[in-house]
Structures are given as structure tokens and as C-alpha cells.
Amino acid sequence: MCKVLIADDSEVMRTAIRKMLREESSIDVVGEASSFAETMQKIADLKPDVLLLDLHMPEKRDFKPALVKSQLGTVCTVAVSFSNDTDSKALAESYGAVTLLDKMKLYNEMVPAILRCESRESDIGSLLRKTFKRKAHAT
């Protein structure tokens, strides 16, 4: 089960996203945040696998991308925005997002993006297990 945290300042968007994700049995929405500060706290408390991050929350100017990226740790970040321009893409990259999704196309793109994050983590976990097995057999 892939644990997802939704971070968006719009309650309407958070509700819509939660309803869309409810249809996917392999995804569990573990929480919601309406600000960057609340997002950072919920990441620490809830330990989600994936963060759906609205790039344009009002107080984003108070948060430096490098700081946010370092606090995200191993959380796979999927950025969402109504604008898909060069500046938004650059901001998404600065936060370490694996992709930027257009909010107008979320229904078709969101679940596949989340599942790609989950499979990436599974691939990494599988690779680590194989590596440790080889090392154990070599000793």
C-alpha cells in the first residue's frame, strides 16, 4: 500500500484529489496539509511514501527549495500546479519532484505518477535485498 500525503492550500483541491485517489485500492491517503509548514510536520509524523505537492501555496517564499528538499528525505515528490510553464518546472525540480502534473489533467495523470513512485521504491528495495544477499553469500 502506497501512503500519500496531499499538500495543497485549496480545500477544494485536497478534497477532489482525495476522492480521486480513494478509487485506487493500492493508494492510502494518510493525511492532508494546507501549508508548507504543516506539510513538513506531517511528513515527519506520517512518513508518507509519496507527497503530492502544490507548488504555489501562498507562503512558499518563506521556504527555500534546498531546505524543503533536504527535509523530504526519501519521500517521492509529485508536484502539481495549474501552470506548467518553465518557472514551475524549474521550481518542481528544485524541490526534487519526480514530475510536475497539470491540475487540469490530474484525473488521468495522478495515479500513474504515484504508482511510478511506488515501483521506484520497490525496485530500490529489491536491489538492496539482492545486494545484501550477495554480500552475505560472499562472506
Residue locations for each model-derived region?
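Conserved phosphotransfer microenvironments
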Residues: 36, 52-68
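Conserved phosphotransfer cores of two-component systems
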Residues: 44-46, 68-75, 95
